[in-house]
Amino acid sequence: MIKMTGVQKYFGDFHALTDIDLEIPRGQVVVVLGPSGSGKSTLCRTINRLETIEEGTIEIDGKVLPEEGKGLANLRADVGMVFQSFNLFPHLTIKDNVTLAPIKVRKMKKSEAEKLAMSLLERVGIANQADKYPAQLSGGQQQRVAIARALAMNPKIMLFDEPTSALDPEMVNEVLDVMASLAKEGMTMVCVTHEMGFARKAADRVLFMADGLIVEDTEPDSFFTNPKSDRAKDFLGKILAH
């Protein structure tokens, strides 16, 4: 479903991603872990070319990701993304935030899009907030709207870039619960997160990154109980000590 071959990414002289070769089959849930500056968010953002790459190729569902133009827009429509910040339109209601892309991009009828929006808001547990505006919702609720909005495009892949890092601790679980239920339903997912419990419970596979490299690529149990690299041991020692 996702294939990265020989991917290199620089920011000026800084080598952000080095020789990334990665294949993620359909339905797999991959959690990307690593210290700050390891390249995990950059990896996530290159998958739908929010970040360009200097070398290599990225394929989504067998098609090479174009550099720009309509082909890129079409492929991007198949890749949902949820960020740290919710990026909801403040002047639109929750329901209208969710219906906007299906109507504009997928050319869906308004009545159909509204029906879809309500079913997705129900799925993430906030159908009763449909007519409110983003500022009237908590951070956790807004992030769940962002997930519903991404799902409204019926994506083949969902990317999550630290979706809980801007939330108050008591709101983290409500977002992780939605992500875990998506994982159970067979959505192909790439999640950059610091939530170790989620990685253990929901991931099929853990990628550990450091210095722009994929240092470990293994099953969650193996990573948490028997990390192979010193970098991973050091990372887990710091994270799990608290």
UniProtKB/Swiss-Prot annotation:
It catalyses: a polar amino acid(out) + ATP + H2O = a polar amino acid(in) + ADP + phosphate + H(+); L-glutamate(out) + ATP + H2O = L-glutamate(in) + ADP + phosphate + H(+). SMART domains: AAA. It comes from the Bacteria. ATP binds at residues 34-41. It is an enzyme of class 7 (translocase). The keyword Iron does not apply. Its EC number is 7.4.2.1. Residues 2-236 form the ABC transporter domain. Coiled coil: none annotated. Belongs to the ABC transporter superfamily. This is Glutamate transport ATP-binding protein GluA.
